[in-house]
A protein has these predicted regions:
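Glycine-rich, flexible N-terminal cofactor/catalytic loop recognition
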Residues: 2-42
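Hydrophobic/aromatic beta-strand patches that form the interior of the parallel beta-sheet core
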Residues: 6-8, 36-38, 82-84, 107-109, ...
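A short acidic, often aromatic-flanked loop/helix-cap motif at beta-alpha or helix-coil junctions
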Residues: 41-46, 136-139
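A short aromatic-anchored loop/beta-hairpin motif
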Residues: 44-47, 52, 56-69, 77
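Conserved RecA-like P-loop NTPase ATPase core
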Residues: 59, 112, 199
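S-adenosyl-L-methionine/SAH cofactor-binding core of RNA-modifying enzymes
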Residues: 63-113, 118
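Structured adenosyl-cofactor binding patch, chiefly the S-adenosyl-L-methionine
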Residues: 117, 121-170
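Long, charged alpha-helical interface segments
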Residues: 170-226
Length: 230
């Protein structure tokens, strides 16, 4: 079965966007995955197709209405796949989570806006809240593109070299080692001699040491996380 993403958004024109380029675009063209876009405004109320209201209890901004979202979800989304909503309150997105979603038949995604969506919709439909980082975006579309770009490359027959995804950052819980290519010397900077030695055992050891050192320096939290899994 082809992996597919069903997306509910106020801005359907934002898709596929960059997802029709590079690896994800080629995979989309080949039918390795499908992208289905639904316009939330089609389910809006009244002559102005209203989809939001002021927050109950007061506060700034607007909240996407539960009745509008429920109608759209029931009409657009399949019952047999998980629903995702990107929110700063969600669980942090990581490689392990991406891999979990890549081995099922697809996901349904709600792109939020304004102050978010009515909590009752999250509770009623058992929606998984996910955060792409400790910062605020204008809407869920950009987060959705980040999520899908990362996921699609894990699908079968997307990457040309099957070993590529095995050695990337986060795949083994660490950051990837530095990469070099020709010319061997550039503006006085040389490729490390070990990488040109042909000694595969020594090269692998160098790569592992570099990976560990970089992770300790830039993402020590990953070291702790890796130890906790052992």
């Amino acid at each position: 079965m082809t992996w597919s993403a069903d997306i509910l958004t106020l801005y359907p024109e934002m898709f596929p966007g960059p997802l029709d380029k590079s690896l994800s675009g080629k995979a989309l063209e080949k039918g390795i995955w499908n992208l289905n876009i639904f316009d939330l405004k089609d389910y809006g109320l009244g002559p102005h197709k209203s989809v939001d209201e002021k927050p109950s209890g007061g506060g700034p901004g607007m909240v996407l209405r539960a009745d509008v979202l429920d109608s759209a979800i029931n009409d657009c989304f399949k019952k047999d796949r998980p629903m995702i909503y990107f929110s700063p309150k969600g669980k942090p997105l990581d490689q392990e989570m991406i891999e979990r979603f890549s081995v099922i038949n697809g996901v349904s995604i709600i792109c939020g806006h304004f102050e978010g969506i009515d909590q009752r919709i999250i509770d009623m439909h058992d929606i998984e809240e996910i955060s792409v980082g400790d910062y605020i975006l204008s809407g869920g579309e950009i987060a959705t593109i980040v999520f899908l770009d990362s996921l699609v490359r894990l699908l079968p027959n997307v990457l040309g070299n099957g070993d590529s995804k095995k050695i990337e950052s986060f795949t083994d819980g660490l950051l990837e080692y530095p990469q070099y290519t020709k010319p061997n010397e550039f503006k006085g900077l040389k490729i490390p001699d070990i990488l040109l030695s042909g000694n595969h055992k020594a090269i692998k050891e160098w790569q592992e040491n570099q990976s560990l050192s970089l992770t300790k320096l830039r993402r020590p939290d990953l070291i702790t996380k890796k130890k906790d899994k052992i």
